[in-house]
Every structure is written in structure tokens, then in C-alpha cells.
């Protein structure tokens, strides 16, 4: 049975699902139809964070140009250029039992590629979600539908998996940012540019 979360809610993942080690984190979205302009290219990215909330190295940033991190414990499906169709637009496989011990938190981000140049923002995006699926059974465990209260933001931290007392939990974040992926990467301690 799927647990639906609202912004700010946290839920146990491994404690309530004993033996769970491999999950798929699916991210999805729709773009609002409007005349003219450029096509949207939304991207999901993953940041592997230490206890200080920072990436220890550029290898802790997983995205369409670096599909794997955490010694192979986190694998990105690759870039979906259109976001068309039903279901997940992009997904990330996480082997929770293999995530390196120095990683305390795994942050899942959705950004709009070239948002500023294309005059695009999350006010033009709807039905964004993040969900967690048991990779072995394909059962949806957790779903967080992001509210559509974004306007000028070009990046969203959708949610985070984090360690707590030896277990993994999920937090529905839903925080929007201006400045796109570069702003979030900088906040997470990476050099950009």
C-alpha cells in the first residue's frame, strides 16, 4: 500500500519494509501547453551528501552526464528529453545496503535545462512527483505529489532519503530555487563553472 506524503512529512522506509534494500526512485512531471517558445527539458539529478549536508567530491553528483555514484549504489536511468507520456520520466536505482557509510542523505532534484535562456520556470510545470518503488516487487511504497505553488523557480529539491538510527527514511521536501542546478550544486559544496 502506497503512503502518500505532503510537503514536510517524513516516513520510515526500511523500518516499515524489513529486508528492503533495492529501490527505484521515480520522478515525473508534465509541462503546461502554451503557444510558441521552446520545448521543455526537465532533468533529475541526485546529490550524495555527508553529515554536513555537502558532497565530498564531484563523484557524489549523479546526473545525465554522470549516471553512477556511491561506488555503484546509485544509478541514474539517463535523460528523458521530452517528459512525454505517463509514469516516471526519469528514475534512479538505489541499493540502500551498498550506499557508502559516509553518505548520510541522498537528495533528489528536478531542474529545467536552460531555464533562464528559454524563459521557463516551474510555474509552467504540473503534476510533478517523486515516488519510491521496491525494485524487486515493483510495489510503490511512497509517493509525494508536489503542490503546484511554484512560479519563478527553475529547480526543486523534491525529496531526500536519509539515514536515521541505522534505518533509511524519506522526507518530502518540495523546496523551489531560482538559479537552477548550479545554485543547488553550489549549496551542496560543489564548484560550478
Swiss-Prot record:
At the top level of its lineage, which domain of life is listed?
Bacteria
Could you tell me which Gene3D superfamilies the record lists for this protein?
Answer: sav2460 like domains
Quote the protein name from its UniProt record.
General stress protein 16U
Among the Pfam families in the record, one is TerD
> By its UniProt entry, which InterPro entries does this protein fall under?
Stress/Tellurium_Resist, TerD
Induction conditions? By heat shock, salt stress, oxidative stress, glucose limitation and oxygen limitation.
What's in the keyword line of the UniProt record? Stress response
Which family does the record claim for this protein?
A: Belongs to the CAPAB/TerDEXZ family.
Q: Where is the signal peptide?
A: none
Amino acid at each position: 500500500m502506497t503512503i502518500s506524503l505532503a510537503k514536510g512529512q517524513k516516513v520510515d522506509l526500511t523500518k516499515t519494509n524489513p529486508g528492503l534494500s533495492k529501490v527505484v526512485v521515480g520522478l515525473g512531471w508534465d509541462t503546461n501547453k502554451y503557444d510558441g517558445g521552446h520545448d521543455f527539458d526537465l532533468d533529475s539529478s541526485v546529490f550524495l551528501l555527508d553529515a554536513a549536508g555537502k558532497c565530498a567530491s564531484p563523484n557524489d553528483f549523479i546526473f545525465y552526464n554522470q549516471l553512477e555514484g556511491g561506488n555503484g549504489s546509485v544509478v541514474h536511468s539517463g535523460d528523458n528529453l521530452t517528459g512525454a507520456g505517463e509514469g516516471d520520466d526519469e528514475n534512479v536505482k538505489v541499493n540502500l545496503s551498498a550506499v557508502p557509510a559516509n553518505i548520510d542523505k541522498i537528495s533528489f532534484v528536478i531542474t529545467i535545462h536552460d531555464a533562464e535562456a528559454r524563459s521557463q520556470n516551474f510555474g509552467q510545470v504540473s503534476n510533478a512527483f517523486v515516488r519510491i518503488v521496491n525494485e524487486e516487487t515493483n510495489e510503490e511504497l511512497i509517493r509525494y505529489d508536489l503542490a503546484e505553488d511554484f512560479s519563478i523557480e527553475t529547480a526543486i529539491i523534491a525529496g531526500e532519503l536519509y539515514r536515521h538510527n541505522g534505518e533509511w527514511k524519506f522526507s518530502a521536501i518540495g523546496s523551489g530555487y531560482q538559479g537552477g542546478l548550479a545554485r543547488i550544486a553550489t549549496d551542496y559544496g560543489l564548484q560550478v563553472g
